[in-house]
């Protein structure tokens, strides 16, 4: 066991995880089955486009639509494709605490570099805290606390209690809204005892989050390489230039949906399928949506170093 800032920490092949961790959308074929080739392509895209880590499946990956067997099976798919190039964080959120623990155990058995979970819906903070204790009973590596509205959110002092109690809790994804203020709250309590506080919200508030103590963010992966550029420029000290790039990207983040994510990944030659597991309804992209997206993509073309945007079909 390592000691991190005076705290006995967990074992992991990645000593420290921070930066931009891309969240993989789950691709489907015409029959609604997980499309392995596209999932592999998305994982490889994250590796090749300079992202700092991979997370699957969380909200972006529609964990709530995935069966237990296919979720565990495709953790193996993602890890096989990544091949140790980046840390892979396994999303363990579920419909019950027992299911979360099942996924945490699968992460241990299959060698996930970290696991992340938020409490099941319609539970409370005490159940959430017990859930992380039970995860630590079956998983030896670093655990990420995902603190989100509507999923038994924890107060800053409760997050600090978990950090004190559980050696494996080395990371926090703080996304109670307003995110930057809550990141500042958690940073003031545990910033010297965790390795990274991640933000969320698709990177919408990335500069403000970094300014308040975050060392990373977990956005959907389809444009996360641009967020990597923002992150790197910010860490290099040119904060105004980082904000300029962020202002160019922000209109695209603001219209992000699951159909949008799949569409961008297809435009970048990553996904072959735009299929949804459930009907997208009003979120389905129409011709006007695609024209607007194309206009907004032109603004960030020079910020994209690989996987350029292909023409709309």
Regions found by a protein language model. Name each.
Residues 149-257:
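Catalytic alpha/beta core domains of metabolic enzymes, predominantly
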Residues 66-69, 126-131, 156-158, 211, ...:
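Short secondary-structure transition/capping segments
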Residues 33, 51, 112, 167, ...:
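Residue-level recognition of short, well-ordered coil/turn positions
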Residues 39, 75, 100, 132, ...:
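A general structural signal for well-ordered alpha-helical segments in protein cores
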Residues 13-152:
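Active-site beta->alpha loop and helix N-cap motifs at the rims of alpha/beta catalytic domains
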Residues 1-10:
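Short, Lys/Arg-enriched N-terminal segments with co-localized hydrophobic residues
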Residues 80-86, 110-111, 139-141, 164-168, ...:
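Short helix-capping segments at alpha-helix termini
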Residues 47, 207-313:
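Structured C-terminal cap/extension of enzyme domains
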